[in-house]
Amino acid sequence: MTLNLRVMTPNRTVWNSEVQEMILSTNSGQIGVLPNHAPLLTALDIGITKIRLNGQWSTMALMGGFAMVDNNQVTILVNEAEEAAGIDPQEAKETFRIAQTNLARAEGKKQVIEANLAFKRAKARLEAIDATLSYASN
């Protein structure tokens, strides 16, 4: 038995296929979704989503949004999403380094909030790459 997963941003459909299971990063922690999961509507935090398809795990960086699970259909609406395989590791590391520096130097409430958001996005992209590399080494 499988789940039908659709991941959509305002501009495109990032993923649209059947999967065996997935792990979502919600605002209150991670949640696993298997076939026949109870209906659910949840906010998604900036973080990674792990997807198992044909026994292999894939990872995607999601930049906040919502997920709805109902009748083996999972619909994810996010501001932005990137599959780990499409993220340039060098660029992601550099973006993370810059985000760390900007967060440390941020002054004033607005600057701190913006720097923290950029840091969380950069961290999610790096975590997606790291998770994919750990799956490949197992």
From Swiss-Prot:
Domain of life: Eukaryota
Pfam family name, one: ATP-synt_DE_N
Cell compartments where the protein resides: Plastid, Chloroplast thylakoid membrane
Assigned keywords, A-Z: ATP synthesis, CF(1), Chloroplast, Hydrogen ion transport, Ion transport, Membrane, Plastid, Thylakoid, Transport
GO cellular component: chloroplast thylakoid membrane; proton-transporting ATP synthase complex
Keyword Ion transport recorded: yes
Secreted among keywords: no
Described purpose of this protein according to its UniProt entry: Produces ATP from ADP in the presence of a proton gradient across the membrane.
Family, similarity comment: Belongs to the ATPase epsilon chain family.
Subunit structure: F-type ATPases have 2 components, CF(1) - the catalytic core - and CF(0) - the membrane proton channel. CF(1) has five subunits: alpha(3), beta(3), gamma(1), delta(1), epsilon(1). CF(0) has three main subunits: a, b and c.
Protein known as: ATP synthase epsilon chain, chloroplastic
Organism: Huperzia lucidula
